[in-house]
Amino acid sequence: MDFLKKSLFLVLFLGFFSLSICEEEKRETEEKENEQEDDREERREEKRLLGMIPVAISAISALSKLG
């Protein structure tokens, strides 16, 4: 009976240990994916702002011609 209890305890412990390792790896993967998504969003914002520069320059030149 003690042998069965020890075996069951060992199996449960190892299962819990492997589950915690899997959860940690999953968390790390999600963090990396979130960082990559943040980088993509920053690049999109930079492209959008860079695309607005010619419009701003043309608006300023048009205003300077009027005044």
Swiss-Prot record:
<dbReference type="InterPro" id="IPR004275">
    <property type="entry name" value="Frog_antimicrobial_propeptide"/>
</dbReference>
<feature type="modified residue" description="Leucine amide">
    <location>
        <position position="66"/>
    </location>
</feature>
<feature type="signal peptide">
    <location>
        <begin position="1"/>
        <end position="22"/>
    </location>
</feature>
<dbReference type="GO" id="GO:0045087">
    <property type="term" value="P:innate immune response"/>
</dbReference>
<dbReference type="GO" id="GO:0031640">
    <property type="term" value="P:killing of cells of another organism"/>
</dbReference>
<keyword id="KW-0391">Immunity</keyword>
<feature type="propeptide">
    <location>
        <begin position="23"/>
        <end position="48"/>
    </location>
</feature>
<keyword id="KW-0044">Antibiotic</keyword>
<feature type="compositionally biased region" description="Acidic residues">
    <location>
        <begin position="31"/>
        <end position="40"/>
    </location>
</feature>
<keyword id="KW-0204">Cytolysis</keyword>
<keyword id="KW-0399">Innate immunity</keyword>
<keyword id="KW-0732">Signal</keyword>
<keyword id="KW-0027">Amidation</keyword>
<keyword id="KW-0354">Hemolysis</keyword>
<keyword id="KW-0929">Antimicrobial</keyword>
<feature type="region of interest" description="Disordered">
    <location>
        <begin position="24"/>
        <end position="46"/>
    </location>
</feature>
<protein>
    <recommendedName>
        <fullName>Medusin-H1</fullName>
    </recommendedName>
</protein>
<keyword id="KW-0165">Cleavage on pair of basic residues</keyword>
<comment type="similarity">
    <text>Belongs to the frog skin active peptide (FSAP) family. Medusin subfamily.</text>
</comment>
<keyword id="KW-0878">Amphibian defense peptide</keyword>
<keyword id="KW-0964">Secreted</keyword>
<dbReference type="Pfam" id="PF03032">
    <property type="entry name" value="FSAP_sig_propep"/>
</dbReference>
<dbReference type="GO" id="GO:0005576">
    <property type="term" value="C:extracellular region"/>
</dbReference>
<dbReference type="GO" id="GO:0042742">
    <property type="term" value="P:defense response to bacterium"/>
</dbReference>
<comment type="function">
    <text>Antimicrobial peptide with activity against Gram-positive bacteria (S.aureus, MIC=32 mg/L) and fungi (C.albicans, MIC=128 mg/L). Shows weak hemolytic activity.</text>
</comment>
<keyword id="KW-0295">Fungicide</keyword>
<dbReference type="GO" id="GO:0050832">
    <property type="term" value="P:defense response to fungus"/>
</dbReference>
